[in-house]
Amino acid sequence: MHRIAVPAATGAPTAQAPVKVAARNLDFYYDKYHALKSINIEIPEKRVTALIGPSGCGKSTLLRIFNRIYALYPKMEARGEVLLDNENILSPKYPMNRLRSKVGMVFQKPVPFPMTIFENVAYGIRHHEKLSKADMQNRVEQALRQGALWDEVKDKLGQSALGLSGGQQQRLCIARAVALRPDVLLLDEPTSALDPISTSRIEQLVEELKRDYTIVIVTHNMQQAARVSDYTAFMYLGDLIEHDRTETIFSQPSKQQTEDYITGRFG
């Protein structure tokens, strides 16, 4: 497996990490609009990679290609390759159910299902696996613990998830995503609708989750990118301008566009 240099999870000297996801000469079209242009990027395993850039730059589009969610909509086309463990997930031969189980996603706005807290987490598991009642209970508890929510909901698993606070709902969505034990977790501006306290809790959770998952996060908050990510990619108008260690991007960017953006002189 190809490896790239990234910061060690502990902040220790540079360590070698396998490449988990790689885009190769990736182009994307919304009908005739060329939204992404020859993107080449490598996402290291069990690290956090942040995608930053102004609105409309293509960062959320790139994120959604990583689990082919665009396939739900007409007149959208991806060209090139996206390799997950060296397999091209854009190939028609790559099973969608397999992709959904290997790549989880959490959206900007919390979207709990209109069912109990327990059933929110169990829903996806039932779609992909057949577990005994005891095994299902254990899996749900494990996911809620990983989502840092178990202690808050363990006595009300039968209550509606819609009664949770916004921050709790987002952590429930994270628990629901990790319940399938995916390899990759995609986070599309997961804290933009949350208060500062809930945002801080999610950021702490991301730091904990990268021990088990490869994480890609889209954020408009550059301070957040600096806090939570090991790698950062700056995008503009469908191009990948620069991709490097987060500390390098924010302290010694190699591209003037990157420096202008992170210092507020962009425009």
UniProtKB/Swiss-Prot annotation:
SMART domains per UniProt: AAA
List of residues binding ATP: 53-60
InterPro entries in the record: AAA+_ATPase (IPR003593), ABC_transporter-like_ATP-bd (IPR003439), ABC_transporter-like_CS (IPR017871), P-loop_NTPase (IPR027417), PstB-like (IPR005670)
In short, the EC number is: 7.3.2.1
Query: Where's it found, cell-wise?
Result: Cell inner membrane
Regarding the membrane, this protein is recorded as: Peripheral membrane protein
Molecular-function annotations in GO: ATP binding; ATP hydrolysis activity; ATPase-coupled phosphate ion transmembrane transporter activity
Name any GO cellular component annotation: plasma membrane
Q: Which SUPFAM superfamilies match?
A: P-loop containing nucleoside triphosphate hydrolases (SSF52540)
Q: Which reaction does it catalyse?
A: phosphate(out) + ATP + H2O = ADP + 2 phosphate(in) + H(+)
Domain ABC transporter: from-to ranges: 21-262
Q: Signal peptide position in this chain?
A: none
Name this polypeptide is given: Phosphate import ATP-binding protein PstB
Record organism: Xanthomonas axonopodis pv. citri (strain 306)
